[in-house]
């Protein structure tokens, strides 16, 4: 994370086999497509607590302190009842940590301090038409982060912060971000094994964002030059208590997450501001029976959200309450895990919503889910595993009620949206390999996921076309996005991953991680009508897809590898990411109206160049990054990082061109 000059943790997630991030949306093994940040099937957690906004269900990546990350755990599929609704597709758990005793003992009275600073610039793209800025001056980004930890008797104290400014490669997408974090943990002096503490993160930012490009030729300019600038504050405060007595462990984790967003377009207020408050508690009790190798975990999770915004049609509140219990049993070389979870959701809206002719103010539903798994050691260093688990996700407020306009594209509400349900299963083999000074783990897995009423962010004609006084269409023909249930779906595939390290000689070693994932995401109800457009025409997966043999906005093949060579004080590393062509998108994106316009209505191309770009990128994307570093002395290190080494043009989805080559210089100090 540090060596790659990671300014947001979501970019580091891209290097994990089977994981992709699109517009902030985490996707594990093709379980999700693209939803513009509304709702998440992947539960992203920091220190075992969700970091997802209560209104839009959006992961708060920018709030995560990259300067204090110990490890990242990825659980693929719905395999544990310890995690709730948003874990339908898997879990990403980011763990922070107090520095090691070795680091602290270097300066016991002063503690441990880490300072990282970087300065980077954005290269010119290969096509001159993409350059909208001064052709003699490159766009720059720069940042500084610090982390300090100190042990004061029985108190562990950490503080950290980050300042980041980015002029951006896309016109208007300027970022100005400041973040501060702290943690305070105390071991009680009177009660043995009683630990309590508090953590917090505070983010103050101004960020520009665009939904789609102006054209393929002007891929770094937003449609109609419209940028949404969000100025806001986000913070979380997390008090917690842990107590162990005998074979019993009690923990209470709590979180208050507050989000304020003030949005404007071209300097004018949009009335799209939103505010939300989230209250979260999780109490967990673990009992270990050592004589029979049995661990019982049981607990309750409660979450209450209050949100207010015109884009969500006023004031809304949501509550989620759950009970869960899981047993883990060891029988010789066999480990067994099984559990159940009961989820209850309710949502209250100040403004009623019409559903089937009735005005509804209150939504509520509940559902149990069951999950289990086996892990068996066949031989030394050889393990086989299998798991099966149910999943369930209640729609977010954004998916149900959002009404807004982004870059002239309307986002429509759908209060009739139903919860999605499903199950996932996996069978896998993990093999440890030792060859001389090299040690690695090879993992191969086959997986399948089934969903009922899958929610998808779908582009279509959901609104009525409007015309100006000259008879020209003034509202994009009523086109826009809406979350809809698309019926039954299935995602199956295989995944191969490898991690390892080794010594070439006494001063040279190598680390590597890589993986390949094949996915076959399909609709099981291709011709079933799941919605109607504004004119009442039935919409099916078949008639709304550019390639109905695969689910929308997904890949079939994804491969990644990262290798780092360390020799004495010098290090060099490289990352490679490949994905094949995103063959299925909303069919309407490929039509003449979108790409060429309609002279009968005096309409130019609405989003020019989508078909042209898809033809150019039909062989997929292959992106290389490279980094070098040199340890100057015991406390200081310099580095140089190049992302998108060959300055390749590529898109994460239609009409969203990714950045050209970037360069960054680093100076890292550890005192």
Task: Walk through the language-model features, giving the residues of each.
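Short acidic/polar hinge/loop motifs at secondary-structure boundaries
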Residues: 15, 49-78
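Predominantly transmembrane beta-strands of Gram-negative outer membrane beta-barrel pores used
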Residues: 41-43, 71-75, 91-97, 103-172, ...
């Amino acid at each position: 994370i540090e060596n790659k000059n990671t300014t947001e943790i979501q970019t580091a997630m891209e290097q994990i086999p089977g994981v992709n991030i699109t517009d902030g949306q985490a996707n594990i093994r093709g379980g999700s497509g693209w939803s513009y940040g509304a709702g998440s099937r992947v539960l992203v957690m920091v220190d075992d607590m969700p970091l997802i906004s209560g209104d839009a269900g959006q992961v708060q990546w920018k709030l995560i302190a990259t300067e204090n990350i110990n490890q990242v755990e990825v659980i693929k599929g719905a395999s544990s009842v310890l995690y709730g609704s948003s874990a339908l597709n898997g879990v990403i758990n980011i763990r922070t940590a107090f520095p090691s005793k070795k680091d602290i003992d270097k300066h016991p009275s002063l503690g441990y301090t880490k300072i990282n600073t970087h300065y980077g610039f954005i290269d010119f793209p290969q096509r001159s038409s993409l350059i909208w800025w001064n052709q003699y001056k490159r766009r720059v980004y720069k940042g500084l982060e610090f982390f300090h930890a100190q042990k004061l008797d029985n108190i562990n104290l950490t503080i950290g912060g980050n300042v980041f400014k980015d002029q951006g490669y896309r016109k208007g997408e300027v970022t100005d971000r400041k973040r501060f974090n702290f943690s305070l943990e105390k071991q009680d002096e009177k009660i043995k094994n009683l630990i309590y503490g508090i953590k917090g993160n505070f983010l103050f930012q101004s960020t520009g964002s665009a939904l789609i490009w102006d054209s393929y030729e002007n891929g770094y300019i937003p449609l109609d030059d419209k940028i949404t600038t969000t100025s806001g504050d986000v913070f979380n405060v997390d008090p917690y208590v842990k107590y162990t007595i005998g074979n019993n462990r009690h923990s209470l984790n709590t979180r208050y997450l507050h989000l304020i967003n003030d949005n404007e377009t071209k300097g004018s207020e949009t009335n799209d501001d939103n505010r939300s408050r989230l209250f979260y508690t999780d109490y967990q009790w673990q009992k270990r029976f050592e004589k029979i190798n049995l661990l019982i975990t049981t607990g309750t999770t409660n979450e209450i959200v209050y949100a207010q915004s015109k884009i969500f049609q006023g004031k809304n509140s949501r509550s989620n309450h759950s009970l869960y219990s899981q047993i883990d049993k060891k029988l010789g070389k066999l480990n067994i895990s099984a559990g159940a979870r009961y989820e209850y959701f309710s949502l209250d809206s100040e403004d009623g919503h019409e559903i089937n002719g009735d005005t509804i103010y209150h939504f509520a539903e509940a559902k149990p889910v069951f999950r289990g798994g086996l892990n068996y050691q066949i031989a030394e260093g050889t393990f086989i595993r299998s798991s099966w688990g149910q999943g369930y996700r209640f729609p977010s407020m954004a998916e149900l009620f959002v009404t807004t306009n982004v870059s002239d594209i309307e986002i429509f509400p759908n209060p009739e949206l139903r919860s999605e349900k499903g199950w996932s299963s996996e069978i896998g083999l993990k093999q440890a390999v030792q060859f001389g000074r090299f040690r690695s783990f090879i993992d191969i897995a086959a997986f399948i996921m089934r969903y009922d009423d899958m929610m998808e962010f779908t582009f279509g004609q959901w609104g009525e076309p409007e015309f100006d006084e000259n008879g020209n269409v003034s509202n994009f023909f009523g086109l826009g996005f809406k979350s809809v249930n698309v019926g039954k779906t299935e995602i199956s595939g295989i995944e191969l991953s490898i991690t390892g390290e080794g010594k070439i000689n006494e001063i040279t070693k190598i680390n590597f991680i890589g993986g390949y994932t094949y996915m076959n995401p399909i609709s099981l109800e291709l011709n079933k009508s799941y919605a109607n457009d504004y004119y009442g025409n039935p919409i099916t997966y078949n008639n709304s897809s550019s390639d109905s043999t695969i689910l929308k906005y997904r890949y079939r093949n994804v491969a990644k590898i990262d290798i780092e060579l360390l020799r004495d004080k010098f290090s060099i590393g490289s990352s490679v990411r490949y994905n094949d062509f995103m063959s299925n998108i909303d069919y309407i994106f490929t039509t003449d109206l979108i790409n060429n316009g309609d002279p009968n209505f005096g309409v130019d191309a609405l989003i020019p160049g989508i078909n042209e770009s898809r033809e150019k990128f039909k062989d997929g994307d292959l992106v290389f990054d490279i980094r070098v570093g040199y340890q100057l002395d015991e406390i200081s290190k310099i580095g140089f990082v190049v992302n998108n080494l060959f300055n390749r043009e590529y898109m994460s989805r239609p009409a969203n061109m990714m950045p050209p080559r970037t360069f960054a210089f680093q100076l890292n100090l550890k005192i």
